[in-house]
Regions:
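Conserved GTP-binding G-domain of TRAFAC-class P-loop NTPases and closely related GTPase folds
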Residues: 2-8, 13-28, 95, 106-146
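Residues immediately flanking
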Residues: 9, 36, 78
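Conserved substrate/cofactor phosphate-moiety recognition/catalytic segment
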Residues: 16-72, 118
Length: 146
């Protein structure tokens, strides 16, 4: 039975690092990664715009369905912290009759921002401080004081 692995965590919490390590240990062609950042990169050079998010969400769901329908496991690499998003993935897994696993990632805000600055210095995607603060205020307020 195919499975959906939902990665959950703020930006810079280690989701993609975990994903990459996991993929190294999977047989080639057995698992597909669906990543909203990658879809944004394909559509708009990685630039986030609210206007484009409807298309990003549509492609994300389409790719998940295609993967499971092809007998593959699917990793959903995004923050996946919003309760509506979690409910959507549970509903989709039920509809597709597949297992769903949630892998949770947490680091304090200070650690995430340190990783964010390092990512920027290495030429990677930088998440604005305001966006990072919003994630922590909304989902992990206790992590702001650490």
């Amino acid at each position: 039975m195919s499975k959906i692995i939902v990665l959950q965590g703020t930006p810079c919490s280690g989701k993609s690092t975990w994903r990459n390590a996991y993929m190294e240990n999977q047989p080639i062609g057995s698992t597909v990664v669906v990543c909203r950042d990658d879809i944004r990169l394909e559509l708009n050079n990685g630039i986030f715009t609210l206007k484009l998010e409807k298309e990003v969400r549509k492609l994300e769901k389409q790719r998940i369905i295609e993967g499971i329908s092809s007998g593959l496991d699917v990793i959903i690499d995004a923050t996946n912290l919003n309760p509506k998003t979690i409910a959507r993935w549970n509903k989709l897994a039920s509809k597709l009759n597949c297992e769903i696993i949630f892998e949770k990632f947490y680091v304090p805000y200070s650690v995430a921002m340190k990783r964010n600055r390092k990512r920027k210095a290495e030429g990677g995607l930088y998440i604005p401080k305001k966006v990072m603060l919003d994630f922590y205020q909304r989902y992990y307020p206790e992590g702001l004081s650490i």
